[in-house]
Swiss-Prot record:
The gene is Anxa5. A pair of annexin repeats may form one binding site for calcium and phospholipid. The [IL]-x-C-x-x-[DE] motif is a proposed target motif for cysteine S-nitrosylation mediated by the iNOS-S100A8/A9 transnitrosylase complex. GO terms for biological process: blood coagulation; cellular response to gonadotropin-releasing hormone; cellular response to lead ion; negative regulation of blood coagulation; negative regulation of prolactin secretion; positive regulation of apoptotic process; regulation of flagellated sperm motility; response to calcium ion. Annexin repeats lie at residues 13-84, 85-156, 168-240, 244-315. This is Annexin A5.
Amino acid sequence: MALRGTVTDFSGFDGRADAEVLRKAMKGLGTDEDSILNLLTARSNAQRQQIAEEFKTLFGRDLVNDMKSELTGKFEKLIVALMKPSRLYDAYELKHALKGAGTDEKVLTEIIASRTPEELRAIKQAYEEEYGSNLEDDVVGDTSGYYQRMLVVLLQANRDPDTAIDDAQVELDAQALFQAGELKWGTDEEKFITILGTRSVSHLRRVFDKYMTISGFQIEETIDRETSGNLENLLLAVVKSIRSIPAYLAETLYYAMKGAGTDDHTLIRVIVSRSEIDLFNIRKEFRKNFATSLYSMIKGDTSGDYKKALLLLCGGEDD
């Protein structure tokens, strides 16, 4: 199934008229949140950037700053995220995951494991332009051990391109993983890192099938048994992303909402970052793999203007 987002360019777009609607929604007493959320969720990111430019031209004011002073809570966070230029959004999330005391490994793992080599190259460039530092250096400074090594391998963005599959190499890699884990006292983490971090996607899908045949285990079961902590989470995220990026992100969204409390940071990040890439596919995978739809789960787990905006971005129910 071809990848598609839920948010596209609005036809008949008029940035100046939109800027006027937003100014009116925030001027005077009270704020018209409905006008803001209905308008911004129906525009692509590129169009939102144009609206912000028109807003500054017409009123001499910064649209995002105005919204920050008028809106609050999760709804404010969501709207501010929608206004970040797409190419900077992942870089921004990574920067914040690395900033200050403590590292948000969950964010590092999710973004670096699920982005394609092309996307990772663009993220590295945006990060350097925006923050004046090298993403890989910052990651190395904030992580350690095999977890750090796997992140560095992925950040090289040198995964083999998808070409004709070499069955002999598939067999060799599957055997090497079996020997590095299940057949060994201890684990040869480097073998897992090299194979999972550098082989092509189509090759690895075949390796996972072959691994099941020779070992009797899914590769995920072996990773679960043989590794732990951040490295385990990263290797599992890579394997799941190799199998299907939309399925991995659907699972990420599911666990952000399942049980008590909601991980709103993850919910906002995945919905916003994928809304123009593959959120439609993520929705389909969500419906297929869980006993509910993404739309229903958001509806039951969030409230107010925040809920309204997320549902509009989600783009519909999947029965």
